[in-house]
A protein has these predicted regions:
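C-terminal catalytic domains of large/alpha subunits in multi-subunit enzymes
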Residues: 1-54, 62-64, 68-200
């Protein structure tokens, strides 16, 4: 939403700031990911930021997603995720990194794959044969950095999950000019968004 408002206001997406720590993770992730670099046609970068869980002690997270979109099939290939996380003092670096890697990949799964189908009030996905989570072959390159901080430690349960889908959605927009606003972002949804863009 911030990216869309920023574009409407004529500013860069990562210029839509807020708290100092949010502005810091946004600036750092943009620099780390090479925000603004030239990409081939059909590819795009999207940026997003979140904070959570407790308002008194939030974890600030920013993410840049790099995608390639096939305009014919609607297939989205997630090439890379870059995340910068400010969770205060990191007590156990290896554990923190593992937590953020897992959280980010869960975010990818929710953004591009997982979604329950219903028909006549009944769940259609009764086993993993029909319910498709993220698989090893779909795992993108991950680059995660923690902000060095003297603040007290904060949570790392889900912050890296929540930032991924909006970054991917913004990257799809950057690649195609089409907005997809519902999850999961499957090829059919991308094709509908592309068709809607052409009608506008």
């Amino acid at each position: 939403m911030l990216t869309a408002r920023g574009i409407n206001a004529g500013s860069e997406p990562n210029a839509v700031g807020g708290a100092k720590r949010m502005a810091n993770v946004l600036a750092r992730v943009a620099e780390k990911a090479g925000w603004g670099k030239s990409l081939p046609e059909g590819e795009g970068m999207g940026i997003a930021c979140t904070f959570g869980q407790e308002r008194a002690a939030p974890t600030w997270t920013a993410c840049v997603a790099e995608v390639a979109v096939d305009n014919e099939s609607g297939e989205v290939t997630l090439n890379k995720l870059t995340l910068v996380v400010d969770a205060g003092s990191i007590v156990h670096p290896d554990g923190a990194l593992a937590q953020c890697e897992g959280a980010a990949l869960w975010g990818v799964s929710l953004a591009l794959h997982e979604g329950t189908e219903f028909a006549a009030g009944q769940v259609q996905d009764t086993n993993l044969g029909g319910y498709r989570p993220l698989r090893m072959g779909d795992v993108p390159e991950l680059e995660i950095e923690f902000v060095e901080s003297a603040h007290h430690p904060m949570g790392l349960g889900e912050p890296a999950t929540t930032v991924v889908a909006p970054a991917i959605g913004n990257a799809i927009y950057a690649a195609t000019g089409a907005r997809v606003r519902h999850l999961p972002i499957r090829p059919d949804a991308v094709k509908v968004a592309l068709a809607d863009r052409q009608k506008a």
